[in-house]
């Protein structure tokens, strides 16, 4: 994604708020995140001076300073003595932050960011499936079997199917005992679950094929086959995304 600097008029354009937000600092932060990601304020350039931001958003200096502090915490800007507030390179941005990730996905026509997200999820969940196959007790195995059977009944109801889909993956993650891995995956999923770019094509055929993958994962965990469970999870997450994905080009980050 290449940032394209915008005109000074656009950079100082007031946001199209239909009503004045209750939390002004949060609203200003969200707007500035979007502008930075879009390239209105490119990496290496300074944010507009404080008085300009106050005028643009019709807010006080206190609100602007709070918003800039939040942008610093997200890794989008650095305050430099004598140089002002500088926009940082994308490599410094906190991509686990909801606003940053959401804005980046919205601007990324190539879907590369979602490819990276899926690749990250695939690595973590494959490892957790490996551990789950070694640790899963009868209760976990029964739960996974029940979810697979329930999803077989829901292939004509994608919305309900996806709820059980998430429950299946969460059961595997919980069975692994990896709280950090589970937290990262759940955080990533929570931030993209309502994105049409991420959900993509999810009709009956997708649900049927997807649940074949779930059944394979369940069978390998039930057989206490760590390597097989990891491979089944890796293949399932890859195949499911390739089917849902509707962007240009090949998802090269997923090729192995």
Positions of predicted regions on the chain:
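Juxtamembrane/interface motifs at transmembrane-helix termini
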Residues: 65, 161-165, 201-206, 248-254
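Hydrophobic alpha-helical elements and their junctions with loops/disorder across both membrane
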Residues: 32, 55, 69, 74, ...
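Juxtamembrane helix-loop transition sites at the ends of transmembrane segments
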Residues: 61, 71, 195-198, 246
């Amino acid at each position: 994604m290449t940032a394209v600097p915008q005109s000074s008029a656009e950079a100082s354009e007031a946001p199209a708020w239909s009503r004045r937000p209750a939390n002004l600092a949060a609203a200003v932060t969200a707007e500035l995140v979007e502008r930075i990601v879009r390239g209105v304020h490119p990496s290496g350039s300074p944010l507009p001076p404080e008085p300009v931001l106050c005028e643009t958003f019709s807010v006080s200096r206190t609100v602007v300073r709070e918003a800039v502090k939040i942008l610093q915490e997200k890794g989008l800007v650095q305050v430099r003595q004598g140089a002002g507030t500088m926009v940082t390179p994308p490599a410094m941005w906190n991509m686990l932050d909801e606003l940053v990730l959401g804005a980046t996905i919205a601007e990324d026509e190539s879907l590369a960011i979602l490819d990276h997200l899926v690749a990250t999820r695939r690595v973590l969940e494959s490892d957790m499936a490996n551990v789950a196959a070694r640790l899963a007790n009868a209760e976990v195995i029964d739960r996974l079997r029940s979810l697979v059977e329930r999803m077989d009944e829901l292939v004509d109801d994608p919305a309900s199917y996806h709820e059980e889909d998430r429950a299946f993956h969460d059961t595997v993650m919980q069975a692994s005992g990896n709280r950090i891995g589970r937290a990262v995956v759940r955080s990533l999923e929570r931030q993209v679950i309502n994105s049409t770019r991420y959900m993509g094509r999810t009709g009956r055929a997708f649900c049927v094929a997807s649940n074949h993958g779930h059944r394979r994962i369940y069978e390998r965990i039930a057989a206490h086959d760590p390597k097989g469970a990891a491979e089944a999870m890796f293949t399932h997450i890859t195949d499911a995304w390739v089917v849902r994905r509707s962007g240009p080009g090949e998802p090269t980050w997923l090729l192995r």
